[in-house]
Amino acid sequence: MIRKIDVYGDRLRSRAHQLTPRLLQVASYINENREAVMEQTAMEIAAVLHTSDATVVRAIQALGFGGLRDLKQTLEQWFGPVVTSSEKMSTTVNTLTSDVDASIDFVLEGHQHTCAVLSEPGNRYAMAQAVSLLAQARQVAIFGIGASGILAEYTSRLFSRIGLPAIPLNRTGIGLAEQLITLQRGDVLVMMAQKSAHREGQTTLREAKRLGIPTILLTNATDSRFSKEASVVIHVPRGGEKGKIPLHGTVLLCLEMIILSVASTEPQRTIKSMKRINELHRGLKPGKKSG
């Protein structure tokens, strides 16, 4: 097995004694949050540490890097190549080529493993905590981007059906900012995210923290930066090991467990909401006259 050369770590260890306390704070943050730094600008790092972007750049240069771009290129080599979704699909279909049973087993085994993990005491306790938070929420916001954005939209509809107002947070750029502006104190955030500390997730967490909104994280990366900041972490395996495609049905499985649990803890609210939806639906059928 080839040993990775940790250029950044080696330089930090050899030069830490030469850094001022402020520069050492920046250098240590980068070392402890490497994945997040890959997605951050100097100004964003500075904002986290309550310092200036010039201080961030000086700290990076003090360790022998030309700047933030040079640092990121070095960290990227340390992390290794990123496996794209097309490469994951290629690995999966090549493994399962011309074997329908193997494809069926791949999905079934992935879901069976997730069911076993979700039923473990630790996850049951985490889901109970999540349900307790959601039952008292003013509104629930469901965060997910990419394929998880579709789950966020669907889940928000399910929560609304049982009488708990819900909104999806599933856009990027200014679109996500427009969704985030609707958050208020008393809300609860349900977040679907993995290891990559992307800007959308970081911004959403910062806004939730500013408003005192608790976060429920559904993830397979229980050691991620998001996991450290969440109020409740539910471990949801996705079956994407060895470069294969991840399964999104496993996340939906967990979401439906949570929604049904919330509905059962507030039965009167759930029944009242469902009855009202049916009444409104009847009024929308052809031939119905408005009063």
Can you say where each PLM-predicted feature lies in the sequence?
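A short, charged, Gly/Pro-tolerant segment at domain boundaries
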Residues: 268-291
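HTH-adjacent hinge/linker in prokaryotic transcriptional regulators
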Residues: 4-9, 17-18, 24-25, 32-39, ...
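Glycine-rich phosphate-binding loops that contact phosphosugars or nucleotide phosphates
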Residues: 135-253, 259-266
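Alpha-helical scaffold segments in soluble metabolic enzymes
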Residues: 7, 11, 25-29, 58, ...
